[in-house]
Amino acid sequence: MVELFLKGLIIHLIADWFLQSDWMSANKTSLLHPAAWVHSGIHTLGYLVIFNPAIAITVGISHLLIDTRKPLIWWRQIFQQSPKGNVAVVFEIWQDQAVHIVILAIASLIS
């Protein structure tokens, strides 16, 4: 399980930090934009290497939805977490990464 999680984390970091273009980064928050689908497709393809197809596709779709920022905005509203200024950007980036990593941990546990 730990080995599977570490492989998933490496795939995630490569797809999110090295393979994500400026085009994807700027447009992935809209489900109507192809960049969102291309970005999550890259993640899904990577996850297909280590997870069974159902789990890989589920993790890929979760990545797509998390990157719209709507679940993160909902979380901040429910728990009244609304940092301001430059801290808000950093908080959003790391909140996004934390949620993706939790999803990978769950996927690794059930695989």
Please provide the spans of the model-predicted regions:
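Alpha-helical transmembrane segments and their helix-entry boundary regions
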Residues: L32, I55-V59
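Transmembrane helix interruption/hinge and helix-loop junction motifs
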Residues: M1-L4, L48-A56, S111
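Interhelical loop and helix-boundary elements at the membrane-water interface
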Residues: G8-H43, L64-L109
